[in-house]
Amino acid sequence: MMSDMEELGGRFVRDVVMKGTNANIMNAMQRCVLALYTYDDNPEDISPENVLRQSLELIAKLPEIAVYSYHAYRHFRKDDTLFIRNPQKGLSLAENILLMLRPDGKYTELEAKVLDIALILHAEHGGGNNSTFTTHVVTSSGTDTYSSTAASIGSLKGPRHGGANLKVQNMFADLKSHVDQDHWDNEDEIITYLKKVLNKEAFDHAGLIYGMGHAVYTLSDPREVILKRFAQALAEEKGMTEEFELYNRVENIAGKLIMEHRKLFKNVCAKVWTSTVDLYTACLVFRKNYYSDLCYCTYAGLECSPLGRTD
């Protein structure tokens, strides 16, 4: 059923996605979602049945919008080659994302499985996070599905929410510039760098080790535990076990450092935005570093869906 809802149509891609490209893909997705309102024959109907239809269509179309917006950004802003590949019926959302994203359209079964699991776990993340709560607040006014979804994508973009995973990736890139690859197994050098981060002497000088700490979970984030296992298998498939071990080492060290620095008496665990999840997905599933711009955009359609209005 979902595969029948995926295609945007050439007119929409040409007239909306490819024109007026944004510097940020999340803003491009907001614009495209609002434009879908004009392609809906019944956009204002907020009955449960119609909202369900609209939400399913958005979930099916947003990965395509994200990938196409990314390609438009790379072409018009970075002068890269532009290629557009249509989704194939019968493939999962994750498989179509990888098919449309990569120049050769190739991916392994494990890559698709890891991305599929990541999409599902993000979609199942309850209704209490910032973007989902935004959906509840905006829909309570009686507005249309497209307006509420666009608002939620705006929330997800923020660096204290979905945008935090880009901070994680940038932080690890900065760490690698300070700790040579030959020393990735040297805990003392990693500790020195992380202490500088906490003391606002390194990275973005915010004093935060991104990807660590959760408002509810202390011992572990169950989503992170699940995805970490698959990320390790993917690292082995791609010959990146050394990098996986670096991320794992930082995770093990950072929690203790944060507890000491802030004088906390509760455990600090890695959360689902940490390197052990989204950074692995970005580096291993998406392969190229510049795909990191797209990483959290792929979750937007699932996390921001206004299905909660039908509760």
Regions found by a protein language model. Give the residues of each.
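Hydrophobic alpha-helical bundle cores within soluble ligand-binding/oligomerization subdomains
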Residues: M1-D311
